[in-house]
Structure formats: structure tokens, C-alpha cells
Regions:
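Non-heme Fe(II)-dependent double-stranded beta-helix
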Residues: 1-15, 22-145
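Non-heme Fe(II)/2-oxoglutarate
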Residues: 43, 51, 190-191, 218-220, ...
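Secondary-structure boundary elements
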Residues: 100, 108-117, 150-154, 164-171, ...
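Extracellular structured ligand-interaction cores
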Residues: 113, 118-120, 155-161, 171, ...
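Short, structured patches in soluble enzyme cores that scaffold and shape functional sites
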Residues: 120-125, 139-141, 158, 162-166, ...
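Short edge-strand/loop segments of extracellular domains
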Residues: 126-128, 177-184, 239, 245-251
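A short secondary-structure junction signal
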Residues: 130-137, 146-149, 170-179, 185-189, ...
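Double-stranded beta-helix
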Residues: 154-157, 167-227
Length: 313
């Protein structure tokens, strides 16, 4: 397997909490995933004019579950209109991209473990005019843990946002602030003390960086990193992206998706094409695990008749 990230990328992530890796995915992967996006989000149409629901002085729409306890507004709901959990009724190209071997290796490297779990993975399609996608700066720990980020980054998690379309500043790239910059003005403490602090938002915007890039670009960041979505303003513009979040196995302080809860989804599209390594990211025991007995092998085969279980026998 060709490694698609470098030690420098890992070092930057450890220091700054975020790093952009261009051309992480190749043209064929981009083409195949894009085809699946069009299948699972059919008939979506972008407008010629961007939607702006902000009032003068606003710093983006509030996000749900960012520790505010306030109800989600209509605009915020619209931002997540095309935000869906895997698996989908499409090819393995999209269904397995969140557990691509290079993403798994990246997660293992930064979390310093060989045993990682995928705890969130969604396809996200945005279209100009469908919503006002501008967000205020926030951190993901608000809805990924009930406490706060650990001081040991290996006890936190890593989130990947992958673009499968070219993303310019007019296509709603994620903006983020390096950890060393936000720490310089006690960003986390100020956020927790007053989540509506306009001056804090202004300060964060002074240091914001853009993750804009061509299709195949990867943004990796931690749950303690301030970031925000930006609005799509390109006439007829759209953005196809995938989120993929990993944590160390056994880290129960972090969570988001309970995969068995989505049992009605077409899991055969994953089981019939994934490797044992990829399936383990969903919590499926590896070959040789004591879980696998003649009985469990037989029953699991009944559940997924077309799954090739030869490596587990």
C-alpha cells in the first residue's frame, strides 16, 4: 500500500491540530465516488444566488449541540439537509471511502495505536442557495464527548473531511484556526465561558485558514480545533464531501454514531467488499478472535449470505 501522508503531516497535526493534504485521493477514486454522490442525492439543484440569512454583525448560524442547549434553528437544519450516514444503496466506492486503508493508517499514526474505530462517517452534499452555510467558529468536542478534549491527543480523535469536487472559496471550504493561534488568546476557555462572545469570534477570524483545494483534498483536524463552514456563493455551485472520524478502540469517552442502530441500512454493501481490517473499524471482530465460533460464523453467514468469510474460518 502506498502511504499518502508524511511524517510532516502527522507532526503538523500534533502541533497545530489540523493539516491539509492535497491530492490524497486519485482521479479514479474521485470519479467513482462522485458518481455515487449523484446517485444518493438525485435531483438536487443549485441556485444561481447564494442564500444569506445573517443579520448585520452575525458570525454565522449557530450549530446544534455546541454546548449551548438552544434549539436548532431552521437555517441550521437546512445546512444538514444532505448529510447522511453510511452505508448507502450504491457502489463500494463511496461506502468504503471512509475506511480507505490510507485513512486508517493516518488515524493509527496520530492516535499511536493499531486498533482504531470509525465512529462517524457521512456523505455531505451542499448546493448554492439551498441554505446559508456560514457557521460560527466551534469545536467538535461539543457533540463528540460529554466532557472536554483530553490533554493527550491520543485520547481524543481525528476527523477527516474529504472533498470530491474542486472547492474554491466560492464552494464553501472549511475554515480553521491552528491550535497555537487559538491557545494564544485562551480560545477554549473563552468559548466555554461565553459561546456567544462576538469579540472571540472576531479574534478567531483574524487567524482563520482555508482548507480550499482541488478534488481529492483532505483536511484532518482534532475535536479541540476551532473551525467553521463557509457559504457557497458560486452560481450553480456544489460541494461533495465525506466526513470520517476515528478514535482509539476502547475510548468510550468519545462517540457519535452507534452503527447497529442503523441496521436497516444496506450493510451488505460494506460486508461484501470490505477487508477484515476495514470491518474492524466498525467493531467487527478480526479473524481469530474468540468471538468467532462455528455457531457465530454460521449465523453471521445467514445474516450476510454473500459475504466471503473464508478469512474468518
Amino acid at each position: 500500500m502506498t502511504i499518502r501522508f508524511s511524517d510532516a503531516h502527522v507532526d503538523t497535526w500534533r502541533k497545530e491540530g489540523a493539516v491539509v493534504v492535497p491530492e490524497f485521493f486519485n482521479d479514479k477514486e474521485i470519479k467513482d465516488v462522485t458518481k455515487d454522490f449523484k446517485k444518493i442525492f438525485p435531483g438536487r439543484k443549485a441556485e444561481d444566488k447564494a442564500l444569506n440569512k445573517k443579520k448585520k454583525g452575525d458570525f454565522g448560524n449557530k450549530l446544534p449541540l455546541q454546548l449551548s442547549g438552544e434549539p436548532m434553528g431552521k437555517t441550521t437544519m437546512d445546512q444538514f439537509k444532505n448529510f447522511e450516514n453510511i452505508p448507502f444503496d450504491c457502489s463500494s466506492s463511496l461506502n468504503l471511502i471512509a475506511v480507505h486503508p490510507s485513512l486508517i493508517e493516518f488515524a493509527r499514526s496520530v492516535l499511536k495505536t493499531n486498533d482504531v474505530r470509525l465512529y462517524q462517517a457521512q456523505a455531505w452534499a451542499k448546493f448554492t442557495g439551498e441554505a446559508d452555510f456560514d457557521q460560527a467558529f466551534h469545536c467538535d468536542f461539543g457533540n463528540h464527548t460529554l466532557t472536554v478534549p483530553s490533554q493527550d491527543e491520543c485520547l481524543n480523535s481525528i476527523t477527516f473531511i474529504i472533498y470530491f469536487t474542486d472547492v474554491t472559496e466560492e464552494h464553501g471550504p472549511t475554515h480553521y484556526v491552528n491550535r497555537t493561534d487559538s491557545n494564544g488568546f485562551e480560545g477554549m476557555k473563552r468559548f466555554l465561558k461565553n459561546r456567544e462572545d462576538v469579540d472571540h469570534q472576531k479574534e478567531l477570524r483574524r487567524f482563520e485558514r482555508s482548507a480550499a483545494g482541488p478534488a481529492g483534498t483532505l483536511l484532518a483536524y482534532g475535536i479541540d480545533v476551532f473551525h467553521r463552514g463557509t457559504n457557497l456563493t458560486e452560481p450553480g455551485g456544489y460541494r461533495y464531501a465525506m466526513t470520517s472520524c476515528f478514535k482509539k478502540a476502547g475510548n468510550d469517552s468519545i462517540g457519535y454514531t452507534s452503527w447497529p442502530w442503523h441496521f436497516t441500512k444496506p450493510w451488505q454493501n460494506i460486508f461484501e467488499h470490505a477487508t477484515p481490517d476495514q470491518l474492524s473499524c466498525f467493531g467487527v471482530p478480526m479473524p481469530g478472535d474468540p468471538f468467532w465460533t462455528e455457531e457465530t460464523l454460521s449465523l453471521t453467514q445467514l445474516r450476510y449470505p454473500k459475504w466471503n468469510m473464508s478469512e474468518y474460518r
